[in-house]
Each structure stands twice: as structure tokens, then as C-alpha cells.
Amino acid sequence: MRRVVAGAFALGLVVVACADPFAVEPRQAAGPVIAAVGDIACKSLPNDHERRCRYNRVAEAIREMAPDAFLALGDLQYLHGAYEDFIAYYDRYFADLKDITHPVPGNHETYTLYAEGYYRYFGARAHPPGGWYSFGLGSWHLVALNSQLCKGSTWTPELGQRAPITTSPAIDKGCGPGTPEYEWLKKDLVTHPARCTLAFMHHPLFGSEPYPEGVFLYQLQPLYELLDEQGVDVVLAGHEHNYQRFAPMDAFGHADPDGLRLFIVGTGGDTYGDLPEGEVATNREAAQDRSFGVLRMVLGDDEYSFEFVSAPGEREF
């Protein structure tokens, strides 16, 4: 279940092995293709603004990849994840991808009570009431997590109160040991001891932003610890509106060749999120904040290849 990277620390194509610690030459893996990105649709139609609302280009990039699965990494419809906004904006460009979409909710989806717009739009694909689930793709095991549950509730401006964030109030209890999501994840990973495993959620445990919500990140850490303990290879997240790739590390941010490799792919077309100038996050291998685009991964039997693909009309990296 573990991995060693091969290739340069660039945004281009590299291959990683899930098991034995040996390097291979940069090349394309053979297997199912996934596209992954979050932080997508503005509450307005696409435009040519320099920094925002170009999610139509991202949808086009995904279609050109013809992936077997699209992992939608949360904050899919701004500002509040209302069902009417999903229909008016997100659906206009992503409807034909719905049958291959595997979504997770972000914080903006949960600004509507019980994330009603998100669960209504995606239906069974969102796996209510909790929003966590797993599935197989090729030889890989993929796990979708609801990281917003780690807060236990979310601030909803319209309601002026803390509001539940799933369709079942009984589930809004956080994500640490003893909670429904944590215990489900623990059992799922033991039940599916795949050679290669990928987890995806909206929130990254590490990144570039100086989060003001440290308590929330503390609550999120148990999920990452469990993923690391169970030998998960890759974690995909969004939330920060840029692209970042990290070297393997443990759940405390320490470099570890047997740790989790984290990708942050918040380049779905809503807005750019500036990376702090002159600051390099610990263990970060690559990053960019000036191109909307998609992470393309090929999931081989014992390895995977990955590359960041800029959307049509965006700056190439």
C-alpha cells in the first residue's frame, strides 16, 4: 500500500509505485483514468475575468480527458450550495459528467441547511445521510470522506446560527474516534486491504493558508492519522484555490517515505487563491496559483501516474 515517487518535482507527468521502494522512469501508468478538482462554479455564468468564474474551461478539460471517474472535491457550487444555483450554473457545464462524478461536500455546500442543495442535486451519488462512501476502480480502492463533519456544524449566514451539515442530525458529531464516519472508515479500510488506496475529501490537513480555525484542523487530524496507519497512498483535497503537491508525510506533517502523499486541487474555476509570496510550505514539491485546471491520474495495478492539466485557454505549467 505504500509508494515511492519517480521523476522530477514538476507539475508534469511522474509515476509513483504503491509498494516496493524503488524508482521508475517518468512515464504513463496503464489503468483507469480519474480527473479530480474542487472549488468550481461561481454563482454567475462563466466570464473572461482574469481571476474568477472560468469553470466552463475546467469542464471542457475534464471532457477532453475522457476519464473513467471524476472526483469532485467539494465547494462545487458557490456561494451557499443552493439547489437552484446547482441547476443554474454547475449543471449547465457538468451535467454530462454526472454519471461518472463521485462528489464530496465542502463548506459552501453546507451553508444551506442540511446541505440540502448538494444532496438533492447529486441524489444517491452523494450517499446521504452522511456523505461518506467507498468504491473500487481497477485494482484501487477509493474512499470519499465528508471532512466538513469534523466541525460538527457550520455557520450559516442566512440562518444566523450553527446548522447541521448532513441530512441526519444524529451524524453531526465530528469525525474522531467513536464517531460514525471514523468508525465506518476504520472498518472499510480493514475490509478492503487493496494494494493501492486513495482517499478524497474537501479539506486538506496541510497547505499554505494560515487557517483561523485551528480547532477544526485539530478535529480533522484523526481521519488523517487513521488513513496513514492503514497504509493509504494518496489523499486528494481542495479548499485552497490553487494546486499543491506534497512529498509523503505522516499525519503530523513530518516527512515520511511511507506517509501520505497529499494533493490540493482547488483549481476548479471559481477564483484563484494566492500562495503566500516567498513562503514554501513544509514538504511541498510543486505548486501554482495562476491556472485553473485538473489533476489527471492513471491508476495502475501497483502504481499511478499524475499530472496537472491546465484547462483550455489557461496558462500552461
List the model feature ranges, each with a label:
Residues 1-8:
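Bacterial N-terminal signal peptides that target proteins for export
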Residues 34-36, 70-72, 103-104, 199, ...:
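Residue-level marker for buried hydrophobic side chains located in beta-strands
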Residues 39, 74-75, 106-107, 145, ...:
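Active-site glycine-centered loops adjacent to acidic/histidine catalytic or metal-binding residues
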Residues 307-316:
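Short, solvent-exposed aromatic-acidic interface loops
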